[in-house]
């Protein structure tokens, strides 16, 4: 009798269906892991658009008026005929007092906290360059602030048109700080001009030699605000 009852219990267990646990069971009973939210994608830095202020446009327009000129005259006075002299003359013609060498202009921009390295500068900004020529004639690339130019226009793709006084007189230059080491793009559009003879194999393009920009046209805004 007892044997019969035992067989009945065993047969009942064999026919009984087990409880199903949905999902994977590998971690059932293991230590719980705290929920970690998915990492947020890093927000891409969007550089401010190039500004075209009234003062900046006046500086660029003044520089444009010097193109091709063999001498620079502002208000009846002959101006210094070199790169920084042309820059200062453009500012003077735009009624913004400015004077000094490339180094002095750079120091003024730093002192006024208007020096920047944005890839899209503002119209009227001064572009500063290093190592455009071997000023100390030691054969090394250690010549700082050897050239300056005026930003005339800035395109959406970052292509910058500059006006400068170089070996060929007062002419335009092209530069693209988004692609500083490329002379042209895939379509043949010029991105950077050659600004130095590359006998030593070093950088020669405008974008490679550019140190940054100074928005010294803002001097006029500060002068008006102080009145």
Language-model regions: role of each:
Residues 7-15:
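Hydrophobic h-region of N-terminal signal peptides that target proteins for export
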Residues 14-99, 110, 204-227:
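N-terminal capping segments
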Residues 97-175:
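...with weaker cross-activation on analogous glycine-rich loops/strands in unrelated enzymes
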Residues 14-34, 140-227:
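Aromatic- and glycine-rich peptidoglycan recognition patches
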Residues 1-7:
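Sec-dependent signal peptide recognition
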